[in-house]
Amino acid sequence: MTMDQGLNPKQFFLDDVVLQDTLCSMSNRVNKSVKTGYLFPKDHVPSANIIAVERRGGLSDIGKNTSN
């Protein structure tokens, strides 16, 4: 499985080792959440402690970078 349909690993630092399929399944939720102004609801915290920092821009660039 590649990361092509999800988050680009070259743009992110992760503080834990996370399976690629986990990131891919989260990518749509992250993209939608960026538009709504929050990452995860309180009762939907991901089991892995994930901190992603976009190198080139801000969180607003995630949707642009993954939808081309």
From Swiss-Prot:
Purpose: Involved in the MEC1-mediated checkpoint response to DNA damage and replication arrest.
Lineage: Eukaryota, Fungi, Dikarya, Ascomycota, Saccharomycotina
Any Gene Ontology biological process: DNA repair
Keyword list, A-Z: Cytoplasm, DNA damage, DNA repair, Nucleus
Domain of life according to the entry: Eukaryota
Induction section of the entry: By replication arrest and DNA damage. Repressed by CYC8, RFX1 and TUP1.
GO MF annotations, alphabetized: ribonucleoside-diphosphate reductase inhibitor activity
Name the record gives this protein: MEC1-mediated checkpoint protein HUG1
Compartments, as annotated in UniProt: Cytoplasm; Nucleus
Assigned GO CC terms: cytoplasm; nucleus
